[in-house]
Amino acid sequence: MAKLTTEELIEAFKELSLIELSDFVKAFEETFDVTAAAPVAVAGAAPAAGDAGAAEEEKTEFDVVLESAGDKKIQVIKEVRGLTSLGLKEAKDLVDSAPKAVLEGATKEAADKAKEALEGAGATVTVK
């Protein structure tokens, strides 16, 4: 097997959707028995309760979670495919396994547009 350079790996990761990259990270963690949790997360939990409102306003990344597909499952699958780079089978599997994140780390605008599109197709969606 040819050895890939760091640059080649990064280029390959750039082509993955957030869901595919998340699945890769989970598989990597399981295979090598490591965790990708950033040590900064511990420091982020330290602010006092009075700062909770400020932290809420500063949130810049949002997850769009598909809670259920509703009655129009085919339309929801089409919207999932449009929002992600998933193929038909992967999009169907994602919709079938709801509740599941459709987009992770999206901007507020992208998350709102995705929620609107999915709800327009008949899905129940939450933005976290």
UniProtKB/Swiss-Prot annotation:
Pfam families: Ribosomal_L12, Ribosomal_L12_N. Coiled coil: none annotated. Gene3D superfamilies: 3.30.1390.10, Single helix bin. GO terms for cellular component: cytosolic large ribosomal subunit. Keywords: Ribonucleoprotein, Ribosomal protein. One of its GO terms (molecular function) is structural constituent of ribosome. One of its GO terms (biological process) is translation. The keyword Ribonucleoprotein applies. PANTHER family: 39S RIBOSOMAL PROTEIN L12, LARGE RIBOSOMAL SUBUNIT PROTEIN BL12M. Homodimer. Part of the ribosomal stalk of the 50S ribosomal subunit. Forms a multimeric L10(L12)X complex, where L10 forms an elongated spine to which 2 to 4 L12 dimers bind in a sequential fashion. Binds GTP-bound translation factors. Belongs to the bacterial ribosomal protein bL12 family. Forms part of the ribosomal stalk which helps the ribosome interact with GTP-bound translation factors. Is thus essential for accurate translation. This is Large ribosomal subunit protein bL12. It comes from Kocuria rhizophila (strain ATCC 9341 / DSM 348 / NBRC 103217 / DC2201).
